């Protein structure tokens, strides 16, 4: 909308346009930029300013619109029209939605530093003393960070689901090999997700030197096993929760962290990847890329089945390249992240 052109024609903003503009005042600058670029955001990804800040913005907009309209409009009723719009804006109260009360869903830098440094094998603050358990739990956190998979998908991973630097997610409902009382199931679509070389090497070490030395682990295909009680049996959902509970108790900065929070953080990373990798393309094209990459990486059903059919390989390649580039950029400069 060109305000100058509209006002010169004695056309003020409609009530709907005014309300949309004022609603926009409630978002942070970063959120506004993402919306203007055409990036699709999940509800929890919206970040909101304080009510006072929103009110200050609205006041400034009200004064500017009144000034500009009186300056450019030619209508004899411009005073009354400007007054009506100003009163409409003045009576507006910024909307504060429950999911937007400045709740940060993504992992903080402090939390990431703790996970990637203090959970390393042999670190003096590592809450687990057994080396096999240290390595297994580091893998749990690292795989969740790099892939954003669900806890059920994590617990369902087979050793052979990880080949080289690719993790494959499969749906195995009614699996005859499943012996756990609470069977973990994949709720999302099957997909392949790339991981970094460092994480792939660490998984190989765990499988060959730690899991491989446990006799009972050879009786089933699951990647993660117990190294104490029920030695060698597949790791349960409850056991994964206990890992996170121990981490939260050991490090106050990890308060509120859970497997699902890594999934939220993955969406945050995807948004950043799209912004960085496609900053020079048109907003409509960026939104289209978002609609292809995000559903695939997260295992969601695509909006268009035809698009999925014809662009599946392209989507996989683009998603993989972007994800690996982002992960490698993150690990660069963090010395000994995957030290063994």
Where is each model-derived feature located?
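N-terminal core-binding DNA-recognition domain of tyrosine recombinases/integrases
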Residues: 1-98, 122-127
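Short, charged phosphate-coordinating catalytic segments
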Residues: 70-74, 144-166
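DNA breakage-rejoining catalytic core of tyrosine-based enzymes
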Residues: 94-120, 179-197, 215-220
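Basic, Lys/Arg- and aromatic-enriched nucleic-acid-binding interface segment
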Residues: 117-151
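Short, basic (Lys/Arg/His-rich) helix/loop patches that form interaction surfaces
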Residues: 126-127, 241-296, 300-304
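Conserved tyrosine-mediated DNA breakage-rejoining catalytic core shared by Y-recombinases
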Residues: 156-201
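Active-site/catalytic core of tyrosine-dependent DNA strand-transfer enzymes
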Residues: 197-256, 272-273
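Catalytic-site neighborhood detector that most strongly recognizes the C-terminal catalytic loop/helix
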Residues: 296-329
């Amino acid at each position: 909308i060109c305000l100058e052109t509209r006002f010169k024609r004695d056309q003020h903003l409609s009530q709907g346009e005014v309300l949309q503009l004022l609603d926009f005042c409630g978002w942070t600058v970063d959120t506004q930029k993402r919306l203007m670029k055409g990036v699709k955001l999940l509800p929890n990804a919206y970040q909101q300013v304080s009510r006072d800040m929103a009110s200050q913005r609205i006041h400034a907009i009200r004064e500017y619109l009144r000034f500009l309209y009186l300056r450019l409009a030619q209508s004899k009723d411009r005073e009354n029209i400007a007054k009506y719009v100003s009163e409409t804006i003045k009576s507006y109260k910024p909307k504060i939605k429950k999911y937007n009360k400045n709740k940060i869903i993504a992992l903080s830098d402090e939390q990431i530093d703790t996970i990637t440094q203090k959970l390393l094998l042999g670190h003096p603050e590592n809450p687990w003393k057994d080396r096999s358990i240290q390595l297994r739990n580091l893998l749990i956190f690292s795989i969740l960070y790099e892939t954003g998979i669900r806890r059920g998908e994590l617990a369902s991973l087979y050793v052979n689901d990880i080949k080289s630097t690719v993790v494959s997610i499969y749906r195995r409902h009614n699996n005859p090999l499943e012996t756990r009382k609470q069977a973990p199931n994949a709720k999302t679509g099957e997909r392949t997700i790339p991981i970094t070389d460092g994480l792939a090497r660490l998984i190989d070490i765990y499988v060959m030197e730690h899991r491989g030395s446990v006799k009972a682990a050879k009786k089933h295909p699951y990647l993660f096993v117990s190294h104490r009680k029920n030695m060698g049996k597949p790791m349960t959902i409850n056991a994964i929760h206990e890992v996170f509970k121990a981490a939260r108790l050991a490090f106050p900065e990890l308060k509120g962290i859970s497997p699902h929070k890594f999934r939220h953080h993955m969406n945050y990373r995807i948004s950043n990847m799209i912004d960085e990798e496609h900053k020079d393309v048109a907003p409509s094209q960026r939104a289209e890329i978002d609609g292809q990459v995000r559903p695939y990486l997260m295992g969601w059903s695509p909006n268009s089945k035809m698009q999925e059919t014809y662009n599946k390989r392209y989507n996989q390649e683009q998603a993989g390249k972007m994800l690996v580039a982002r992960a490698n950029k993150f690990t660069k400069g963090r010395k000994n992240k995957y030290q063994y």
